[in-house]
Regions:
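Positively charged, low-complexity terminal tracts
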Residues: 1-183
Length: 183
């Protein structure tokens, strides 16, 4: 899927994504450990994490975006979300490593909705938040998801260990599963 997001008077950048969600205000979002994976639910989207690396990429992106969110979303009481033509929902499953996450901040004057935006792309998921409440809901969601992932996969350090400088190990993540299959 190619989305063309108008951000300037020049040719709009192309954003490659499988699923995009645009969020404003506090919203219900949950992460649970179920069937040896982490299931995340938020408005219109369900994400299943079946590999540890996307959990790490998302957590790293949302926590590193806090300073940018504070700057670009300062003073934004409630963002603007385009009205969909109908009810739309999507589901993504991350069962392999994804490229590094991308975080972009757009001030209101460059935003297609004329509301400030913080965009976080992880794998095929693009999440756009337009105010501090939406950012906080997503930060809490991905922090909870990462905590579940760190309990599920032993190669992920805890949130506290990450803060102290520990790094995850992804070099042999498939080896135990392959060894079990060969036995």
């Amino acid at each position: 899927v190619h989305l063309h997001l108008a951000t300037t008077d020049h040719r709009p950048p192309t954003v490659r994504t499988d699923l995009a969600v645009h969020l404003a205000g506090h919203h219900e979002a949950h992460a649970v450990l179920i069937a040896r994976t982490i299931l995340l639910t938020m408005p219109s989207v369900r994400v299943r994490l079946a590999h540890p690396q996307p959990a790490y990429e998302a957590y790293k992106a949302w926590t590193s975006a806090a300073d940018r969110a504070a700057r670009v979303l300062a003073g934004a009481e409630s963002g603007t979300v385009p009205e969909p033509d109908g009810q739309v929902s999507g589901h993504l499953r991350f069962d392999r490593p994804v490229p590094p996450a991308v975080v972009e901040a757009l001030p209101a004057k460059l935003s297609p909705t004329r509301a400030p935006q913080l965009r976080v792309s992880v794998g095929g998921l693009l999440t756009v938040v337009t105010d501090k409440a939406a950012f906080t809901s997503q930060l809490n969601l991905w922090t909870t998801a990462y905590r579940h992932a760190a309990r599920r996969w032993s190669n992920l350090p805890s949130v506290e260990e990450l803060a102290a400088g520990a790094l995850p190990r992804f070099d042999d993540i498939a080896a135990p599963a392959l060894a079990k299959a060969a036995a």
